[in-house]
Amino acid sequence: MPPSISAFQAAYIGIEVLIALVSVPGNVLVIWAVKVNQALRDATFCFIVSLAVADVAVGALVIPLAILINIGPQTYFHTCLMVACPVLILTQSSILALLAIAVDRYLRVKIPLRYKMVVTPRRAAVAIAGCWILSFVVGLTPMFGWNNLSAVERAWAANGSMGEPVIKCEFEKVISMEYMVYFNFFVWVLPPLLLMVLIYLEVFYLIRKQLNKKVSASSGDPQKYYGKELKIAKSLALILFLFALSWLPLHILNCITLFCPSCHKPSILTYIAIFLTHGNSAMNPIVYAFRIQKFRVTFLKIWNDHFRCQPAPPIDEDLPEERPDD
């Protein structure tokens, strides 16, 4: 083991690799399932595919770059900054995709009769494009000047060096904590989290209200329709918990770094916080896809057709989304 890599770093790298090995195949399988099953082509699954694409990129690109940054190679300042920014872009896209799915589920409960007229594939595509554009804006903001270049240049000049600074590439050396806390956390992480709390509370309220009133829905069976939506809402509550569990620790540590520079942060806490954020990408296929029967049946067909060489029966596109025991 190279002397520059500590035991904590080695453990961190191993966990990151494990997360990537789970995240990439799991999310590729989600995308594959939508491709082969026509029943998974409505607007709802467009958002799930967008989330899966972001999560594949987290496992295939963000995690390798995070490992590179953790090792800390010697690079030019802007080279290191370019390595750090994709992490911000793709993790932000995951957050916005989660929010889009929450809003989509809210609309299914709020306007069940008009849902398909309001949430069309075209509008879903526009929403997805908007999420990605916002993610690039948020993630590339450090490239436009909100970074630590001035401080690094002062230290570089104080040593009598000329030209662009060469530094040990580490995330906190190039990315401003003011950006991470005031802009990234207080604007693009915390508000979506709070908004999702409100959305999920409203979803539960609407479902309970409709179940009590027994108002007819598009399915013609209010108990069945809203009972299914209640099960889905419980999944959303789990997603909310996992989102908070995955993202808040790292941002709390960033706040400590900014507001209490003298406070000691054990390295192991930083490593745990980082792989929790990446681990959220590995959780999503399990929480979203495996609770939907159409996905489960399609996964089984893919497995039998392509890995066991045993063709599965044709997919019944009229399968209900939820099993009775979910």
From Swiss-Prot:
Report residues carrying sugar chains. 159
Q: Which UniProt keywords apply?
A: Cell membrane, Disulfide bond, G-protein coupled receptor, Glycoprotein, Lipoprotein, Membrane, Palmitate, Receptor, Transducer, Transmembrane, Transmembrane helix
- Where does this protein chiefly localize? membrane
Task: Tell me where in or outside the cell this protein is found.
Answer: Cell membrane
Q: How does it sit in the membrane?
A: Multi-pass membrane protein
Gene3D superfamilies named in the record: Rhodopsin 7-helix transmembrane proteins
Q: Which Pfam families match?
A: 7tm_1
**What's an example GO BP annotation here?**
nervous system development
Lipid-binding residues (covalent, S-palmitoyl cysteine): 309
What does UniProt give as GO cellular component? asymmetric synapse; axolemma; basolateral plasma membrane; calyx of Held; cilium; dendrite; dendritic spine; neuronal cell body
Q: What is this protein called?
A: Adenosine receptor A1
Which residue intervals are topologically Extracellular? Answer: 1-10, 70-80, 147-176, 260-267
UniProt keyword annotation of rRNA-binding present:
no
